[in-house]
Amino acid sequence: MILFRHMEINIIVKPPFKKLVSAQFLKKIASETLKAQAADPSSELGIVITGQEEIKELNCKYRQLDEPTDVLSFYMLEENPENLTAPDDFPTPPDEATHLGEVIISYPQAELQAGAAGHSVNHELAFLLIHGVLHLLGYDHHETAAEAVMKSHQDIAMKHIREILE
């Protein structure tokens, strides 16, 4: 018997933002981004929409920056200290999912940035979610070359989800 597991995307929208954010919208954006990046179909991902205070606390605790930010990504896969990788045909339990991590987005920050950029809050939320998911998939922007690669993937993903935004 072959078991197929579908991507599981868990979403928490904190109470002040429940009427402002569609969990279904976030799920579609994350799902399309993961598919476009050929992520493991058994992947799991968590998304949290929160406020400025909570994201500021997390930013301070984990990045030592005492200020709010728009999005934080928490990578959950453990780094392998011996740099070992299992062969492609290595057996894994059929129901064992790969938990990529958590993407935390500040709704108020997204709202501010959307206003400054002249587009909708949903457009900004989609961009931030794509950005966060790409971080979980290993993309980064600390060096110029890596930043160009990540920006290219963000642009492709934004074009891919254009229909969802309309």
UniProtKB/Swiss-Prot annotation:
<keyword id="KW-0862">Zinc</keyword>
<feature type="binding site">
    <location>
        <position position="135"/>
    </location>
    <ligand>
        <name>Zn(2+)</name>
    </ligand>
</feature>
<keyword id="KW-0378">Hydrolase</keyword>
<keyword id="KW-0255">Endonuclease</keyword>
<keyword id="KW-0698">rRNA processing</keyword>
<dbReference type="InterPro" id="IPR023091">
    <property type="entry name" value="MetalPrtase_cat_dom_sf_prd"/>
</dbReference>
<protein>
    <recommendedName>
        <fullName>Endoribonuclease YbeY</fullName>
        <ecNumber>3.1.-.-</ecNumber>
    </recommendedName>
</protein>
<feature type="binding site">
    <location>
        <position position="131"/>
    </location>
    <ligand>
        <name>Zn(2+)</name>
    </ligand>
</feature>
<keyword id="KW-0963">Cytoplasm</keyword>
<keyword id="KW-0479">Metal-binding</keyword>
<feature type="binding site">
    <location>
        <position position="141"/>
    </location>
    <ligand>
        <name>Zn(2+)</name>
    </ligand>
</feature>
<dbReference type="GO" id="GO:0004521">
    <property type="term" value="F:RNA endonuclease activity"/>
</dbReference>
<dbReference type="InterPro" id="IPR002036">
    <property type="entry name" value="YbeY"/>
</dbReference>
<dbReference type="InterPro" id="IPR020549">
    <property type="entry name" value="YbeY_CS"/>
</dbReference>
<dbReference type="Pfam" id="PF02130">
    <property type="entry name" value="YbeY"/>
</dbReference>
<dbReference type="GO" id="GO:0005737">
    <property type="term" value="C:cytoplasm"/>
</dbReference>
<dbReference type="GO" id="GO:0006364">
    <property type="term" value="P:rRNA processing"/>
</dbReference>
<keyword id="KW-0690">Ribosome biogenesis</keyword>
<comment type="function">
    <text>Single strand-specific metallo-endoribonuclease involved in late-stage 70S ribosome quality control and in maturation of the 3' terminus of the 16S rRNA.</text>
</comment>
<dbReference type="GO" id="GO:0008270">
    <property type="term" value="F:zinc ion binding"/>
</dbReference>
<dbReference type="GO" id="GO:0004222">
    <property type="term" value="F:metalloendopeptidase activity"/>
</dbReference>
<keyword id="KW-0540">Nuclease</keyword>
<comment type="similarity">
    <text>Belongs to the endoribonuclease YbeY family.</text>
</comment>
